[in-house]
Swiss-Prot record:
Signal peptide residues on this chain, from the entry's feature table: 1-18
Lineage: Eukaryota, Metazoa, Ecdysozoa, Arthropoda, Chelicerata
Keyword entries, A-Z: Amidation, Disulfide bond, Ion channel impairing toxin, Neurotoxin, Secreted, Signal, Toxin, Voltage-gated sodium channel impairing toxin
UniProt remark on domains: Has the structural arrangement of an alpha-helix connected to antiparallel beta-sheets by disulfide bonds (CS-alpha/beta).
Biological processes per GO annotation: defense response
Tissue: Expressed by the venom gland.
Subcellular location: Secreted
Name of this chain's protein: Beta-insect excitatory toxin BmKIT1
């Protein structure tokens, strides 16, 4: 019973404090275009304050964006493809 009550208290907090992944958009609704991963990592971490980023399908894909940051609406297949972070 105690476990169930703890679960009910902690579960909503996890949803509020969660981070999201996606193509971050600027104030004009455009995504940063790219060819190199290092460029995207700099854009994502310094401009959008994400934890990291890389170039996925010629646009910067950011990991660990705050919930209040706007992201581009994409298909689930594209999101699952880009969620696999390339090492290197």
């Amino acid at each position: 019973m105690k476990f169930f009550l703890i679960f009910l208290v902690i579960f909503p907090i996890m949803g509020v404090l969660g981070k999201k992944n996606g193509y971050a958009v600027d104030s004009s609704g455009k995504v940063s275009e790219c060819l190199l991963n290092n460029y995207c990592n700099n854009i994502c971490t310094k401009v959008y304050y994400a934890t990291s980023g890389y170039c996925c399908l010629l646009s910067c894909y950011c990991f660990g964006l705050d919930d209040d940051k706007a992201v581009l609406k994409i298909k689930d297949a594209t999101k699952s493809y880009c969620d696999v972070q390339i090492i290197g």
